[in-house]
Regions:
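Divalent-metal (Mg2+/Mn2+/Ca2+)-assisted nucleotide/phosphate chemistry catalytic cores
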Residues: 1-3
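Accessory alpha-helical/coil subdomains and C-terminal extensions
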Residues: 5-23, 33-129
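A charged, well-structured terminal subsegment
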Residues: 17-30, 163-168
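Catalytic-site beta-strand/loop segments enriched in glycine and acidic/polar residues
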Residues: 22-36, 135-136, 142
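Residue-level preference for the first positions of well-ordered beta-strands
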Residues: 28-31, 82-84, 170-172
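C-terminal non-catalytic interaction/assembly regions of soluble proteins
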Residues: 111-214
Length: 214
């Protein structure tokens, strides 16, 4: 994880935390939209930390039917409310199967501001329940960094400065086994860290009852 990630998780988690009170008192379905067009790391971590009931991430295409079933199951258990953490790039299974050309054409007539509002409309129609959308937006990119990020940034900066002193260029400074290391740029530049749907953290999230709408 890069510096800034933990701070963003803190802010997204706080947004979910704040929604819990309103959701519980009004007995509604709430959607908290979290940043992440291509990668769902922020949504995954904030969803777990904030106690979201459903997390939708780009790496796991969702089915609106599965989401409805998850909400109905909570209603039968008298939970009273449901909170969804939805990544900006969450995508339904039918669109995930489209070609880039087909998807581009579809998006030309897309009527919703974001996917969260589309999901809200579908849930309202199918379940007859009120659904509210909250978008923390760019607040996730600002504010004061958390202590972890401050320490991480300081360590990486010091290690980068030492690389310059050593006249050793063409590297990114990373952390491996809690030690700063120099990683060749060609091994890291331009690469996204996608979530493996079969990873242990996904399995653990499912074990505690989080649905991914799959």
């Amino acid at each position: 994880m890069t510096f800034g990630f933990q701070s963003a998780v803190d802010i997204a988690t706080q947004a979910i935390d704040c929604i819990h009170t309103t959701a519980a008192s009004h007995g509604r379905v709430f959607i908290v939209e979290v940043m992440g067009h291509k990668v769902g790391q922020l949504t995954l971590y904030a969803g777990i930390a904030g106690g979201a009931d459903i997390s939708l991430i780009p790496e796991i295409p969702y089915s609106i039917d599965s989401i409805c079933k998850a909400i109905e199951a909570r209603n039968k258990q008298k939970k009273g409310f449901t909170i969804l953490a939805v990544a900006e790039g969450a995508i339904p299974k039918e669109r995930a199967e489209m070609s880039k050309k087909e998807l581009k054409k579809f998006m030309e007539t897309y009527q919703y501001p974001t996917v969260s509002y589309e999901i809200a409309a579908q849930l309202t129609e199918r379940l007859g329940t009120e659904v509210r959308v909250t978008v923390p937006g760019h607040t996730q990119r600002g504010g004061s960094p958390c202590p972890y990020d401050r320490v991480l940034s300081t360590r990486l900066g010091a290690a980068a400065a030492q690389a310059i002193v050593d006249d050793d260029y063409g590297y990114m400074i990373g952390i491996v086994n809690n030690e700063c290391v120099r990683v060749p740029l060609e091994e890291s530049a331009g690469k996204l860290k996608f979530i493996d749907p079969n990873s242990s953290i996904i399995s653990e999230a499912k074990m505690i009852g989080i649905s991914f709408g799959d």
